[in-house]
Amino acid sequence: MAERNELHKRNRHNGQYDFSRLTEEYPPLKKFIVLNAYGTTSIDFFNPRAVKALNKALLISCYGIRYWDIPKNYLCPPIPGRADYIHYIADLIQPDISDESTGLKTAIPNARQYRCLDIGVGANCIYPIIGQTEYGWTFVGSDIDPVSIDNARKIVTCNPALAHKIELRLQRDSRKIFEGIIAPNEYFDVTLCNPPFHSSKEEAEDGTLRKLSSLKGKKVTKARLNFGGNANELWCEGGELRFLLTMIEESRNYRKNCGWFTSLVSKEKNLGKLTAKLKSTDIAEHRIIEMHQGTKTSRILAWRF
């Protein structure tokens, strides 16, 4: 497989996957190993069962997570990109200590226990898993879906290293983000979120079809589409923009409860309206942090009061 270049320097997934080691750690991955168009060992990334097996192998090999599973048709996230978000958040909240020879931050913020809130933790619980195992952070993960909460809780209870480090809370009002989750006297160093991208199921399906058609170089039809992700993981009324505008507005009421508010922004065109909203809000600072994975660029929007 081609190298996944430009990941964060602390990301364990820089370079090529070591499939020999991964299949040794998780033998069920072997049946999904293929030779790609470049003649190198890989898997079929359009096969959700193969991606799920790869995730299990990576979680065992890199993070010591022996049990991880998700319900059928729930989002199976690419772990390298999820890890990047965690590492860039670490840079955001750690003391500004730099290596004189490279100018790069080298300190890892595990001197004290940081507390994080993951909005939309999902059934996969990936951000809390990586944040806890890499940095020792504790997490609260919220979600509007009871199945996701129950599955994430099972992952935590089945891995002793995560026990008492990750708490799951059900958001009972789908119109709210922080309200009903953050208690009045509770404090988080940072909040994370990977919001739903799309405004409807149809838009989500069409977007996935276009992406797959582009990657495969030929038209992909709905009959051939393996659509990964539950409804609330992929779309919400008003899409990403409305969700994040609501988040910014709600964050004003929790300025004393959170050090940094952050979210991924998948659509670059939304940044203009989001930054305008932030500038009209009495924040102290906002940042846009770019992340690179091969030819893909994604962004973290961060702000604090």
Swiss-Prot record:
GO biological process, one term: rRNA base methylation
EC number: 2.1.1.181
Enzyme's top EC category: transferase
Superkingdom of source: Bacteria
Keyword Lipid biosynthesis: no
Assigned GO CC terms: cytoplasm
Record has Amino-acid biosynthesis as a keyword: no
Keywords associated with the record: Cytoplasm, Methyltransferase, rRNA processing, S-adenosyl-L-methionine, Transferase
InterPro entries assigned to the protein according to its UniProt record, in alphabetical order: METTL16/RlmF (IPR010286), rRNA_lsu_MeTfrase_F (IPR016909), SAM-dependent_MTases_sf (IPR029063)
Cellular compartment(s): Cytoplasm
Family: Belongs to the methyltransferase superfamily. METTL16/RlmF family.
PANTHER family recorded: RNA N6-ADENOSINE-METHYLTRANSFERASE METTL16 (PTHR13393:SF0), SAM-DEPENDENT METHYLTRANSFERASE (PTHR13393)
Role description: Specifically methylates the adenine in position 1618 of 23S rRNA.
This protein's name: Ribosomal RNA large subunit methyltransferase F
Species for this entry: Bacteroides fragilis (strain YCH46)
Lineage: Bacteria, Pseudomonadati, Bacteroidota, Bacteroidia, Bacteroidales
